[in-house]
Amino acid sequence: MAPNLRKSHPLLKMINNSLIDLPTPSNISAWWNFGSLLGICLATQILTGLLLAAHYTADTTLAFSSVAHTCRNVQHGWLIRNLHANGASFFFICIYLHIGRGLYYGSYLYKETWNTGVILLLTLMATAFVGYVLPWGQMSFWGATVITNLFSAVPYIGQTLVEWAWGGFSVDNPTLTRFFTLHFLLPFMIMGLTLIHLTFLHESGSNNPLGIVSNCDKIPFHPYFSLKDILGFMLMLLPLMTLALFSPNLLGDPENFTPANPLVTPPHIKPEWYFLFAYAVLRSIPNKLGGVLALAASVLILFLAPLLHKSKQRTMTFRPFSQLLFWTLTANVLILTWVGSQPVERPFIIIGQLASLTYFTILLILFPIIGALENKMLNY
C-alpha cells in the first residue's frame, strides 16, 4: 500500500500534525476557539493591509488624501479600509477573550506558551499603535505625540529617546515614514511569533476546562474541531462584515476626519477603545514616570500569572471564590475602559484611581490569597 502523502511528505507532515491529526482533548469548549479566530484575524489584517499599502503614501502632505483616495477611487477601497480598521478591533476582542480564557482555566501554567503569548500581545499593541498614526488625522497625530512623549519620562536618556523615535524635534515626516515601515514589518513578526507560540503549545498539548491530564481521552482535531472552528469563523466574520458595511466609523474618532494640524490640539486626546484600560491606569497617577511605569505594569503583570498561582487546582471550574474574583477583575477592566474614554475631571479621576488600585490588588494580592485559602478549604 502506498504511504499516505499527508503523513510522509516533510512539509505536509508538519501541517498534518498541527491541524489534522493533532490529538485534542475531547471536552474543550468554545473558549478554545479564539486561538484559531486570532489566526483568521491576522490573515485578514495582512491581506487587507497589503492591499491598502499598495495605495498608501507615507508622506505628511499626502497620507490623509491617499487614504481618502483609496476610499473614493479604488475598487472596493472603502470596504478594504473599513475591514482593516474594524478588523483591528475584532483582533483585540479575540485576544482579550483568549487571555481571559487562559487566566480562568490556568493555561498560564504552560509557561513558555503563555510568555510567547504575552510577547505577541505586546507586539500586537505596538502594531496597532503605529497603524493608528498612518491616516494622519488629528487624533492620529496627537495620539502619536502624546504616547511617544511618554518615553521622555525615562531618567537621563528620556529626551534623546523621544527625539530618536521621532527622527527630529517633533512628530513629522520621518516619524510617519518609520511608523509605516514598522506597521508593515511587525505583522510578519507576529506571524513568526505565532508559529513559536504553537510550537510550544504542541509540546504540551492543549489544556481543558477541567485542568486535568487528558491523554486518555483525546480525539483528532479534524473533522471535530475544524468544523467547530468554522462555526467560530462565521460567528466572528458576520459581525465584522456588519460593522464594516453598516457603521464603519462607530469605533473610530471623529477627530480623524480632520487632517493633522500641529497648531490645534483636540479637546480630548484618547486612543482607540482597546487601549483605554491601560490609558486610564496611566492617567490615574499624577506623576509622569509613575504613570508610565503603571501603564507598562498593567500589561506586563501578565508575565507574573504563573508565579502567582497558589491553588492546588489548575482551573477555576471548581473554585467559586476565585471565579467571583475573576469576574470582579473583568468588570474592573471594563470600568477602566469606560473611565479612559472620559475627560480628566471629577468624578472620573477618583473612579480611575480606585479601579487602577483594584486591578493591581486583585491580580497581585487577592488571587494568590484566595487560591491558598481554597487549598485550606479542601481539607474540610
Swiss-Prot record:
Heme b b562 binds at residues 84, 183. GO terms for molecular function: metal ion binding; ubiquinol-cytochrome-c reductase activity. The chain crosses the membrane at residues 34-54, 78-99, 114-134, 179-199, 227-247, 289-309, 321-341, 348-368. GO terms for cellular component: mitochondrial inner membrane; respiratory chain complex III. It comes from the Eukaryota. A ubiquinone binds at residue 202. Heme b b566 binds at residues 98, 197. Keywords: Electron transport, Heme, Iron, Membrane, Metal-binding, Mitochondrion, Mitochondrion inner membrane, Respiratory chain, Transmembrane, Transmembrane helix, Transport, Ubiquinone. Its cofactor is heme b. Binds 2 heme b groups non-covalently. The keyword Membrane applies. It is a multi-pass membrane protein. InterPro entries: Cyt_b/b6_C, Cyt_b/b6_C_sf, Cyt_b/b6_N, Cytb/b6-like_sf, Cytochrome_b, Cytochrome_b_C_euk/bac, Cytochrome_b_N_euk/bac, Di-haem_cyt_TM. It is found in: Mitochondrion inner membrane. GO terms for biological process: mitochondrial electron transport, ubiquinol to cytochrome c. Heme 1 (or BL or b562) is low-potential and absorbs at about 562 nm, and heme 2 (or BH or b566) is high-potential and absorbs at about 566 nm. The cytochrome bc1 complex contains 11 subunits: 3 respiratory subunits (MT-CYB, CYC1 and UQCRFS1), 2 core proteins (UQCRC1 and UQCRC2) and 6 low-molecular weight proteins (UQCRH/QCR6, UQCRB/QCR7, UQCRQ/QCR8, UQCR10/QCR9, UQCR11/QCR10 and a cleavage product of UQCRFS1). This cytochrome bc1 complex then forms a dimer. Belongs to the cytochrome b family. Component of the ubiquinol-cytochrome c reductase complex (complex III or cytochrome b-c1 complex) that is part of the mitochondrial respiratory chain. The b-c1 complex mediates electron transfer from ubiquinol to cytochrome c. Contributes to the generation of a proton gradient across the mitochondrial membrane that is then used for ATP synthesis. This is Cytochrome b. It comes from Bugeranus carunculatus. The gene is MT-CYB.
